[in-house]
Amino acid sequence: MTKAQKPESPPIIKDNFSQLSDKINLKGQEIIKFISKTLPHKPGVYQMESDEGKILYIGKAKNLAKRVINYASLNNLTRRLQRMVSLTKQMNFFVTNTEVEALLLECNLIKRHKPRFN
C-alpha cells in the first residue's frame, strides 16, 4: 500500500440487545454482565439506555468487553454511576477500527444526544 492509499474503514457496526433484554427481563448489573460476555475486544463506543429508551450515558473504550464489564462491579463505582447502572435496561455498541475513531464518534454522539450521566 502506498502513502497515497488509505486503508478503508469498515462500517461501524451497531449491536442492539433490546429485543434480547426484553425477553430475558434483565436490568442494571445483570444485563451488563450478560451483554459483556458477547462483546468484542475491540475499540468502540457504548450507550446505556433506560426502560424508556432514553440514552443515559455514552462512553468510548479501546476494548469494549473489558470496559463494559467494569460497570458490573458496583463496589468500584460512585453512587452516581451505581444509579446509572441500575437504570440501564439495554445497551448499544458501535465497533470502530481505532481509538481515534471511537473518540470522534463518542464526541459526536454526546453532542447530539446530551445524555443525563455524561
For the regions a protein language model found, what residue spans apply to each?
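Acidic, glycine-enriched active-site microenvironments
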Residues: 2-118
